[in-house]
A protein has these predicted regions:
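A recurrent flexible, glycine/aromatic-enriched loop bordering the glycosyltransferase active site
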Residues: 138-154
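A short, conserved alpha-helix in the catalytic core of glycosyltransferases
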Residues: 158, 162-163, 168-201
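Conserved donor NDP-sugar-binding/catalytic core segment of glycosyltransferases
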Residues: 102-134
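A conserved acidic beta->alpha catalytic loop
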Residues: 42-51, 68, 98-99
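Short, well-formed alpha-helical segments that are part of the catalytic scaffolds
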Residues: 13-33
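Short beta-strand-to-loop acidic/aromatic patch adjacent to the donor-nucleotide binding site
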Residues: 88-97
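Non-catalytic, C-terminal membrane-associated alpha-helical segments of glycosyltransferases
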Residues: 236-296
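Glycine-rich, basic loop-to-helix element that forms the pyrophosphate-binding segment
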Residues: 67-83
Length: 296
């Protein structure tokens, strides 16, 4: 018989940036009864004060309103610090457009008494392309090397040991970096395969090349910049450059070869390579004309 964590020891956070109200409320409703508190960390959205007023009947919500976009890593660190201040032991991290199953926390609770686990996660079911997995899912649980932030639940004591999320990345690769740190400090990442997160990564699309299924995400050029820069930098930071360089080459081939805005994305990739390898420049993206488009 599993020993369940006390209800007040698990809280959730949703990091927002110009969210759509209906989707955000649906996300809140999906997790509302499963946790004791929900921390909304907003990164300078123009509409957030209105949303805060519209959601005032949800008494479990705690708002952290940043005046500008400080990046996903800094926002997550704010959430963990607040969760820690109210004596929570675990924090569920969510994107603004992800809808969790109603048994997510109940399922995760079966595994949190294992002190070796620093992160719990579940498979991702993309609305457009289906299940995102590098290999067939067979076992009920599986130890994995990495997972995305959304629907992962972190042990707050593990967050303290690794030093938190790396804020210089700003966005993209923040979750991968944290996973590397978690494992370096001796914690395990356990994926629970009996549940799934309904999610949407960009404007995802599946294609087949030489019999192999590959995914396009149609991110805007600024995200291509962050993905390129941060992926290469992580290779340097974690001393496995060849691995991350191959990921960058494959991703760049797909973005430039099969997506729209090819020239802008090619330039974004170039600037990402420059800033990662030559300038070693992180933080917020430079103010370039190719980035003057709507982005998440």
């Amino acid at each position: 018989m599993p020993i369940y964590c006390h209800y007040n020891q698990i809280v959730a956070t949703i990091v927002t940036f110009n969210p759509q109200f209906e989707i955000l409320e649906k996300n809140i409703l999906a997790i509302y009864s499963q946790v004791s508190n929900i921390i909304i960390v907003d990164n300078g959205s123009a509409n957030i004060r209105l949303f805060q007023q519209q959601l005032k009947t949800y008494t479990k919500l705690y708002w952290i309103l940043n005046t500008e976009n400080i990046g996903i890593a800094a926002a997550l660190n704010q959430a963990v610090l607040y969760a820690d201040s109210i004596k929570a032991e675990w924090l569920l991290t969510l994107d603004q457009d992800s809808v969790v199953p109603d048994n997510l926390i109940r399922t995760y609770q079966q595994y949190i008494e294992d002190d070796s686990i620093g992160l719990l996660c579940c498979p991702i079911f993309d609305r457009n392309v289906g299940l995102l997995s590098k290999s067939p899912i067979v076992e009920e649980t599986e130890e994995v090397e990495e997972c995305i932030t959304s629907a992962s639940m972190l042990r707050i004591s593990a967050w303290h040991k690794v030093g938190g999320f790396f804020e210089d990345l700003f966005i993209d690769g923040v979750d991968i970096d944290f996973c590397y740190l978690i494992r370096k400090h001796g914690f395990r990442i356990l994926r629970i395969n009996s549940i799934q997160l309904l999610h949407e990564l960009g404007h995802s699309q599946a294609i087949t090349i030489l019999g192999k299924k590959l995914f396009l995400f149609h991110h805007p050029p600024i995200r291509c910049y962050y993905m390129t820069r941060n992926t290469l930098y992580l290779g340097i930071r974690h001393k496995c450059f060849c691995h991350f360089a191959l990921i960058t080459i494959k991703r760049s081939f797909l973005m430039v070869g099969f997506e729209s805005d090819k020239l802008k994305k090619l330039l974004a990739i170039f600037y990402g390579i420059r800033d990662a390898l030559l300038l070693r420049k992180l933080g917020k993206a430079p103010n370039l004309k190719i980035f003057k488009s709507k982005s998440r």
